């Protein structure tokens, strides 16, 4: 698995999602980049990316 996790959102919601993710998962993330409808999360390690992916899926 790569260090990247992408989250697709409803248009206009990615900025808020990115901000919340960055605050709550700061220790696992190297960077968070968002546009209007998607959030790209770059994890510090592949393990962190996998954990982040699983945690985000649990919210669905």
Model-derived features with residue positions:
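Non-DNA-binding regulatory cores of transcription-related proteins
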Residues: 1-53
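Short, charged, intrinsically disordered terminal tails
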Residues: 52-60
């Amino acid at each position: 698995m790569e260090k990247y996790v992408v989250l697709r959102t409803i248009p206009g919601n990615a900025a808020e999602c990115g901000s919340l993710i960055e605050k709550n998962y700061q220790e696992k993330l190297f960077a968070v980049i968002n546009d209007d409808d998607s959030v790209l999360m770059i994890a510090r390690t592949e393990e962190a990316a996998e954990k982040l992916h699983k945690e985000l899926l649990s919210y669905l």
